[in-house]
Amino acid sequence: LTTGGIRGGKKQMGEYYPRSFNMGITKKVFQKTGGYRIPFMGEDLEFSIRIITAGFKTVLIPNAFVYHKRRTNLMQFYRQINYFGRARINLTRFHPGHLKILHLFPLIFIVGFISVLVLSLLNQNLGFLGLKCYVIYLSLITAEALLKLRSLKAALYTPLTTLIQMSGYAVGFIH
């Protein structure tokens, strides 16, 4: 119910673009593409775009295990997501056709949320209706997390982490 599906999971919402933390390539792919070209945010996704453009196929191996460091606090998570938002803009400069409407969802979410808060000050009824929509959305995310994770503690964190995810990406995107 958030934007996680666009990053690449078992259920693809489009072409699979591997990230460097779980990417394996052949020598032929490296030689034809030249490997990483740019030392900036989103370099792995930029490389994946060039791999696919060069005619190579990318696949997700669902049974492969990848261990990587998770962010250990919410501020680190915010910084990482903010970085992803800024990376999306950098990628769009190199590959304009790869900005999708779904990439705008966090920005729309946060602009809408701020608008609802302002609207609440101007018209309580309309503001309440808007806030109700956000509460329903966050409740659905919490319920989905509870069903998937089977952990009440983790599920109760999802509204907060969703707001951090959306705001971090949106701020990075417009930065």
Residues covered by each model-derived region:
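Short, flexible, basic/aromatic active-site loop/helix in glycosyltransferases
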Residues: 1-17, 21, 31, 94
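Short glycine- and hydrophobic/aromatic-rich loop-to-beta-strand nucleating segment
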Residues: 15-28, 45, 109
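Generic alpha-helical secondary structure signal
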Residues: 20, 25, 76, 80-83, ...
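Short loop segments at secondary-structure junctions
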Residues: 27-28, 55, 115
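Catalytic donor/gating beta->alpha subdomain of glycosyltransferases that bind UDP-sugars
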Residues: 31, 37-99
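Membrane-interface anchor segments at the N-terminal boundary of transmembrane helices
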Residues: 97-108
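Membrane-embedded multi-pass helical conduit in multi-pass membrane proteins
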Residues: 109-175
